[in-house]
Curated annotation (Swiss-Prot):
The gene is MT-CYB. Disulfide bonds: none annotated. Its main location: mitochondrion. Component of the ubiquinol-cytochrome c reductase complex (complex III or cytochrome b-c1 complex) that is part of the mitochondrial respiratory chain. The b-c1 complex mediates electron transfer from ubiquinol to cytochrome c. Contributes to the generation of a proton gradient across the mitochondrial membrane that is then used for ATP synthesis. Binds 2 heme b groups non-covalently. Heme b b566 binds at residues 97, 196. PROSITE patterns: CYTB_CTER, CYTB_NTER. It is found in: Mitochondrion inner membrane. This is Cytochrome b. One of its GO terms (biological process) is mitochondrial electron transport, ubiquinol to cytochrome c. Keywords: Electron transport, Heme, Iron, Membrane, Metal-binding, Mitochondrion, Mitochondrion inner membrane, Respiratory chain, Transmembrane, Transmembrane helix, Transport, Ubiquinone. Belongs to the cytochrome b family. SUPFAM superfamilies: a domain/subunit of cytochrome bc1 complex (Ubiquinol-cytochrome c reductase) (SSF81648), Transmembrane di-heme cytochromes (SSF81342).
């Protein structure tokens, strides 16, 4: 009798995706982050669901409902901080996952890569709206500043901002709709993840060498399920250390002050995972220019398949490209640091230089180096 796992209409989909899936025999730990992102999404949806049971999306009670969750709900503090720090873990995994894709040339799987970029944008939108919900000072002013950027769009900008706000300022209507969007988006993300996997399984996974591995495949289970479990345990360990020992390490103290439209915080800044984009936005004096740079700093990822001029897929055997890649990583870390600093000398100059370097490396230096490496192959 044939195994149910291979014949049952529903179970066989799971079987072909996670059990009998042929996987390259040499994929490294950098390939763990896909499954870790799935785990992060599950954690966020579950903790978010329990938070939504106690949260009220009204400007008068939102802040106190979060306080109520932390003080009066059984393990409410644990759920709330797991959700807040879970978002940070989500973004750490996301950045590493994207970085791995850039380093090993995974972006040549065009559809998988582009859906991945759309996923990144959807997660960023969800995280931004989630940050507004506790209705602290940074929530309110963050929402005001970021939504206000849309007013830079010529002709329709102001109307668009007021339409998003549901009034003439960030108020009750804004909070209510942000809560609605924040609730629905993770499920849209989950659907996009399935499409992401569908396209990935059409081609199979890439591997560190960037070579075709059809002649050397192993089943996903037990080899990579065991390998993923190690990643899962480490992720949960780091998340729990964060939640139980320093839950506010990555947060902003200003958000423990209820939102007050009459008092502006000294430094308005988003959560740490948006700081690199925020630094790029601030480094351009013109409002529309800044907004375009901000959007393009993420959308530039979609250009990677077009800018790939190397004869080799992976950077594994391309030392010059490797050097540039790590300079790009340090540049992004620098931008993250600058995004959290006030706009004054020398930070503004460093931010402008780092922003120019970011776009120059991706659009100019990496493609040129790829061509040089192609020439070096003939030596």
């Amino acid at each position: 009798m044939t195994n149910t796992r291979k014949t049952h209409p529903l179970i066989k989909i799971i079987n072909h995706s996670f059990i009998d899936l042929p996987a390259p025999s040499n994929i490294s730990t950098w390939w763990n982050f896909g499954s870790l992102l799935g785990l992060c999404l599950a954690i966020q949806i579950l903790t978010g669901l329990f938070l939504a049971m106690h949260y009220t999306s009204d400007t008068t009670t939102a802040f106190s409902s979060v306080t109520h969750i932390c003080r009066d709900v059984n393990y409410g503090w644990l759920i709330r901080y797991t959700h807040a720090n879970g978002a940070s873990m989500f973004f750490i995994c996301l950045f590493l996952h994207v970085g791995r894709g850039v380093y090993y040339g995974s972006y040549t799987y065009f559809e998988t890569w582009n859906i991945g970029v759309i996923l990144l944008l959807a997660v960023m939108a969800t995280a931004f709206m989630g940050y507004v919900l506790p209705w602290g000072q940074m929530s309110f002013w963050g929402a005001t500043v970021i939504t206000n950027l849309l007013s830079a769009i010529p002709y329709i900008g102001t109307t668009l901002v007021e339409w998003i706000w549901g009034g003439f300022s960030v108020d009750k209507a804004t909070l209510t709709r942000f809560f609605a969007f924040h609730f629905i988006l993770p499920f849209i993300i989950a659907a996009l993840v399935m499409i992401h996997l569908l396209f990935l399984h059409e081609t199979g996974s890439n591997n560190p060498s960037g070579l075709i591995s059809n002649s050397d495949k192993i089943p996903f289970h037990p080899y990579y399920t065991i390998k993923d479990i190690l990643g899962v345990l480490l992720l949960i360990l780091i998340l729990m250390i964060l939640v139980l020992f320093s839950p506010d390490l990555l947060g902003d103290p200003d958000n423990y002050t209820p939102a007050n439209p009459l008092s502006t915080p000294l430094h308005i800044k988003p959560e740490w995972y948006f700081l690199f984009a925020y630094a790029i936005l601030r480094s351009i004096p013109n409002k529309l220019g800044g907004v375009l740079a901000l959007v393009f700093s993420i959308l530039i990822l979609m250009l990677f398949p077009l800018l790939h001029l190397s004869k080799q897929r992976s950077m594994m055997f391309r030392p010059l490209s490797q050097c540039m890649f790590w300079i790009l990583v340090t540049d992004l870390i620098t931008l993250t640091w600058i995004g959290g600093q006030p706009v004054e000398y020398p930070y503004n100059i460093i931010g402008q230089l780092a922003s120019i370097l970011y776009f120059t490396i991706i659009l100019l230096i990496l493609p040129i180096i790829s061509l040089i490496e192609n020439k070096l192959l003939k030596w």
